Structures are given as C-alpha cells and as structure tokens.
Amino acid sequence: ECHLIISKQDGRITHEIQIPSKGIETPVVTEGEFVITPEFYLTFPDRDKWILVNTSSDTIFHYLPDGNLSPFIVRSPSISSMDTKVFLFPTVITDRYCFMRTMRKEVDFTTFKGFLGEDLVYDKQENALFSYILYNDDFINKEEVSLTSEPRNPEIAICQTLDAPDLVEAYEKGQLKGKLKEIAANLDEESNPVVMLRLLPCWKKVS
C-alpha cells in the first residue's frame, strides 16, 4: 500500500511514497459474500503540504514540498491493538485547529448501517482534544454539517450540496434564515442544487 505521484503530462508514475506499518488494517468489512467499503480518503491538502494517511499505520504524515515525510499525528491506542478497529481521518486543517473524524469498523448486517464516527478537533495552541458538533446557522433548528466531504483544495474547508426540494420545503415551513433563506425564496423544486462552500482564511507563505 502506497501513495503515488503521477505526471500530468504523460500519466507516468513518478514517485511511490511508502508509509511503514506493521500489518494491514482497512475499514472494509467482509461478511460471507458481502463486502462493504465505506467512503474515506487518504490524501488531504494542507497549505503547501499534503497529509497522507495509511489506515494500517498509527502515524499520519505530512508530505513536504521537498519530498520528505514528517510525522503529523500519532494516534493512541494503536490500530493493531483494538478488537473493534477505530480509524482516524483528518478533515480540515487550519493554523490553530486540526479537525478529524473517527470511523468505527462495525456494521449491522440487518440494517446495513454502520461505520459510526465522532467528530474531533485538536487545538494546537491549547494542546487539547475535543469532541464537537458543527451546525449550519442558516437553519432555525441548526442542521448538522459534516466536514467529511471529498477533499477539494487548500482554500475550501467544506463543500456541501443542498437539494432544491428540501430547501423549498424548509423555506415554506419557516425553517430558514439569513442568506440561505434569501436564496431559497427564489427556488422551486426543479431548481439546481445549492452548493455551500466554507473557505479557509487566506494565508501567505513567509520565506
């Protein structure tokens, strides 16, 4: 298992990035003929660096511009020591905070629901870890927002799609406020989805 750097010019693999691990641990669940693969990502942008995850490793690494790996997060307990595996994935990184989400390797095969997780944030200044729930304040009832969308680029923290029929219904029930209420007022059920972006603060590279 490794990360690959591929040339945009000709599609060649120019570099293989190996992350050491003691064995193979993966969130994929198998039960008889069933194979269930949850959605998860192993590469995340972080300013001028990249965060690389190997689900078999207890260490999450930074891949630096000079091509070297630097440890970023070391988890405890070790993934190999857990009876029920709980994986850790970064989601959004800022100057002060590292947002993450856990994923429990567990599925109820009567409902085919599972892979429950918890949202965590590490405060670099306070050296403290917290569990959190993020809400969209444009909903009166404060709809929960996930930071687990597909990684985009270093400037976009969240990219969430809101379906027009759901927004129209929420608007008619008086469940919206703020900018989202203004947008929903001009929608009908046949309108295109609304894309909500949350941008990270601007940053400058200092030499």
Positions of PLM-derived features:
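Beta-strand C-termini and the immediately following turn/loop, strongest in propeller blades
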Residues: 1, 52-57, 100-107, 161-164
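Loop-centered beta-sheet repeat module
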Residues: 3-64
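Beta-strand initiation motifs
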Residues: 12-15, 67-70, 127-130, 204-206
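Structural signature of eukaryotic scaffold interfaces centered on beta-propeller domains
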Residues: 29-49, 87-100, 145-154
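Conserved blade-ending motifs and adjacent loop-strand segments that build the rim/top face
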Residues: 69-93, 120-156, 162-163, 167-168
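Blade-level signature of beta-propeller repeat domains, shared across WD40, Kelch, NHL, RCC1
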Residues: 153-207
